Design a protein with these regions (language model features):
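Structural recognition of the beta-strand scaffold that forms the well-ordered cores
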Residues: 34-40, 69-76, 113-118, 148-153, ...
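Aromatic-lined carbohydrate-recognition surfaces of secreted/lumenal glycan-active proteins
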Residues: 112-129, 179-201
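N-terminal module-boundary/linker segments of secreted carbohydrate-active enzymes
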Residues: 23-54, 59, 178-179, 187-189, ...
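C-terminal beta-strand-rich structural cap/linker in extracellular carbohydrate-active enzymes
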Residues: 383-435
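Fungal secretory targeting signals
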Residues: 1-25
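Carbohydrate-binding surface patches
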Residues: 269-272, 277-279, 324-364
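Glycan-recognition surfaces
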Residues: 137, 183-184, 188-281
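Aromatic-lined carbohydrate-binding/catalytic grooves of carbohydrate-active enzymes
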Residues: 56-161
């Protein structure tokens, strides 16, 4: 969110040295798949009211965004009054949000879930009441208003001798409160942590939440997109059903991102199985940017019902593997999907480039097989790949997204006898080695 300071790579470098250990995911009946929807912060910050929120939901229906899966509309910071009531309740702004229950009723009637925002400290990042020491009371208030989703920020942290907890314990307080609310009311919230990647959240986030921020706030420019992709590349193992890395809300339609950069942004977020929260003004979005958000072949990977895991790098490309470089992140990625192996290639250069890989560099490709190639952006079937694939003339900061489907045995008699990594140990049954 909102005013989250830039804590680039804080704790991420530690993660390079040890892969994330998997924790038991919070399987509480909601949040199995990445949330898709809208959050108002990137476009409007504090300049929001209930009319804008409903108008946004209506645009989402008219533009077909609800039809392709964007079914959440979430408030961010600045919806509250600056002071609590005499009995301690948090109070919505009487001018801009005079009736929260009416707002959520309207969103639900339109077919959307409704999301709200709070903070784990004394105040939100914009200076409104935080939920520290009011966790259960606020959670019950949010439930009574009809909300389904809670984004929880990291500002205004109490003194150590007051909180006597680290980041994990601070967020556990609200997780416990949400559990109590579920037991009392039957309402289970999707819980989204906005703790900026602090305290190696990829090791523990899944024990209490459905998503967790891995870095500081995103910006609508390429250097921010590249930096976040770099941070994510080392911790992809943490993502699965019910719990996932969150690289922050989408900036498609904002700032000076080119069309190709916006495609790369969306592709990376979607194929990493991140939440997809639109963050631009839908009243002025271009048809080109809208087409990116509505790419159903990319969305299908994000919402895969069989595999909940993220794509991961199999080769860094420009840099040696495992290089932490915020400007030139990993370029060659792959992952599993219901319908085949997913490949993502990112040209991190400022000029067009050809991008080549051996198929078996991906762990999900079988040796000795050929693969039908589906381009997820041109929506075309592009022949059959045998042993390798080259994407020609990839645009600066551009992306190629492919779905490779097994198409049977490769042609007989191909040399070398073993391709890729296996070539260094290629051995006949009689022990003869072939290099």
């Amino acid at each position: 969110m909102s005013m989250c300071s830039s804590f680039k790579a804080l704790g991420i470098a530690v993660g390079i040295l040890s892969a994330p250990s998997l924790v038991t995911a919070l399987q509480n009946g909601v949040g199995k798949l990445p949330v898709m929807g809208y959050n108002a912060w990137n476009a409007f910050e504090c300049n929001v009211n209930d009319t804008l929120i409903i108008q946004t939901a209506q645009y989402m229906k008219v533009y077909g965004l609800l039809d392709v899966g964007y079914n959440h509309v979430n408030l961010d910071d600045c919806w509250a009054m600056k002071n609590r009531s005499s009995t301690g309740e948090v109070v919505s702004d009487t001018i801009r949000f005079p009736d929260m229950k009416n707002l959520t009723d309207q969103l639900h009637a339109l077919g959307f879930y409704a999301g709200i925002y709070s903070d784990s400290g004394w105040f939100t990042c914009a200076g409104y009441p935080g939920s520290f020491m009011y966790e259960e009371q606020d959670a019950l208030t949010f439930q009574s208003w009809g909300f389904d989703f809670l984004k929880y920020d990291n500002c205004a942290i109490p003194f150590d001798d007051v909180i006597r907890e680290g980041v994990v314990g601070k967020y556990q307080r609200m997780a416990d409160a949400l559990t109590v609310v579920a037991e009392k009311t039957g309402t289970t919230f999707v819980f989204s942590l906005c703790q900026w990647g602090w305290s190696q959240v990829w090791l523990w986030g899944a024990s209490m939440a459905h998503s967790w921020r891995i870095d500081g706030d995103i910006g609508p420019y390429w250097s921010s997109i590249a930096s976040i992709i770099n941070s994510a590349s080392f911790i992809t193992q943490a993502t699965n059903y019910y719990g996932r890395n969150d690289p922050d809300m989408l900036e498609i339609g904002n700032g000076d991102l080119t069309y190709d950069e916006a495609k790369t942004h969306f592709t990376a977020w979607a194929l990493m199985k991140a939440p997809l929260l639109i963050g631009t003004s839908l009243a002025s979005i271009s048809s080109q940017m809208l087409s990116i958000l509505k790419n159903t072949e990319i969305i299908a990977i994000n919402q895969d019902p069989v595999y909940g895991t993220s794509i991961s790098p199999f080769r860094w490309g420009i840099n040696p593997d495992w290089t932490f470089n915020a400007s030139f992140p990993a370029q060659y990625w792959s992952g599993q999907s219901e319908n085949g192996t997913v490949i993502m290639l990112i040209n991190t250069l400022d000029e067009p480039a050809d991008m080549f890989f051996n198929l078996t560099e991906s762990p999900w490709i079988r040796a000795g097989r050929q693969y039908a190639v589906r381009d997820l952006w041109t929506h075309t079937s592009n022949g059959t790949a045998v042993r390798s694939f080259t994407a020609a003339d990839v645009a600066p900061h551009g992306v190629v997204a492919l779905l490779l489907q097994d198409a049977g045995d490769e042609p007989a008699g191909l040399l070398p006898l073993c391709a890729g990594e296996a070539s260094t140990q290629c051995t006949a049954e009689n022990g003869t080695k072939y290099y």
